[in-house]
Amino acid sequence: MSVAQNTFPLSELMISLTTALDMTEGQPPEHCIRCCWIGMHIGMQLELSEPELHDLFFTLLLKDAGCSSNAARICELYATDDLTFKRRYKTVGTSLSSVINFIVKNTGSEQSWTERILTTIDILKNGNDYAQELIQTRCTRGADVARELRFSEAVAQGIHSLDEHWNGQGRPEQRKGEAIPLFSRIALLAQVFDVFQMEHSIEEALQEIMARSGVWFDPKLVEVVEQLVENPRFLSGLKATDISQRVMNLPPAQAHLPLDDAYLECIVTAFGKIVDAKSPYTAGHSERVAVYTDLIARQLAISDADRIWLRRAALLHDIGKLGVSNAILDKPGKLDEAEWRAVQAHAAYTEQILYKLSPFKTLARMAGAHHEKLDGTGYPRGVNGDEISLMTRIITTADIFDALSAERPYRAAMPIDKALAIMEENLHTAIDPECFAALKKALNLLPDEYTQLPHSSDKT
């Protein structure tokens, strides 16, 4: 297995990974990148220092790093599709009537009319507490991700205070005015401007931020945006099809910060946690699949260098699930045809996301094919065994084992021996026999934290 060397800049990796963050917010592609374009031009107009522009750059790209952590709770509280809910919520006006109208229209879409009325009443009664909880969860997790990615505390705080408002009526801490970190003020302004210019027009986006000046936004920053929209180069860049490259050409992105293996591992692990945070039923899934993958690979005498990259592919194999609604992922009953197609799409999303990352181009197909089957009945391409690499077969075996042995929305965790028995029934069709044999041997070598998996003989 040949992979690219770690000579690419940190900015390239982060820009590419924003595709996944856009998905989890239900936003059009390149939302975070456009926000970075907008926010960086604000920062340059303010003549921020080089270190400040560097931190602002990554605050803007990673502003949504914690958003997967409240997806399941949104579905639970509002009984609706989290992706659609999040996308529509960002276009709600500031008036009470706009908020109430949004709640009535978007609550209970997965329920009967009677249940919907009861849920809506609950939201109208307790919505303030729920909103605080959801934003607190997202902000705290987003800041933690920034720290895990080794960014400065200024970046972490910029993400944590994204939803604070100039008038002190924001969340999670009701900070007011200049007590709100500058990076947060810029990021929220850039976010709202992009959402409205994509949904409507530049003119309407400008009207919206001007209407919120002194309420949501720092008036001085709004004035900067008013000046920017008079700049043809700013507007053409915002609408350009190559905006990713244009953002890559900004000064902070040009600072060459090569990644060593330890830092790359840190980044991959952090994004694996972002994926797993989307559902309570996927908590720890990516890490466990990576552990099982590595143990199987050891049994098959895969080289140390290839095992490192194989483990990274395993950590990110489900990153495409950020683009699937929790209303589907956490559904306790049988999926209908449309829902099943949505679930299947996650494998293709994984490949698309990873292919954008220079070091992962070779791994993209490998990770995205983890639901292919040897008999050709898998997805996304329906290829047969001859076209499925050994590396993919290893990840597939690890993924199936964890899917069976972990708790699911529709059943409790399955004992190891029962999971292995089911897997054995699917040898030569879905599961590679050599990989399965390696898994059985590898289970005796599990790290201590994985030795508590249930067995049929265990008392319940």
From Swiss-Prot:
Binding-site residues for a divalent metal cation 1, renumbered to this chain: 317-318, 399
GO molecular function terms noted in the UniProt entry: cyclic-nucleotide phosphodiesterase activity; metal ion binding
EC number(s) given by UniProt: 3.1.4.-
Residues at the catalytic site: 321
Effect of residue 17 to H/K/T: Large decrease in enzymatic activity
Superkingdom of this protein's organism: Bacteria
Listed name of the protein: 3'3'-cGAMP-specific phosphodiesterase 3
Organism annotation: Vibrio cholerae serotype O1 (strain ATCC 39315 / El Tor Inaba N16961)
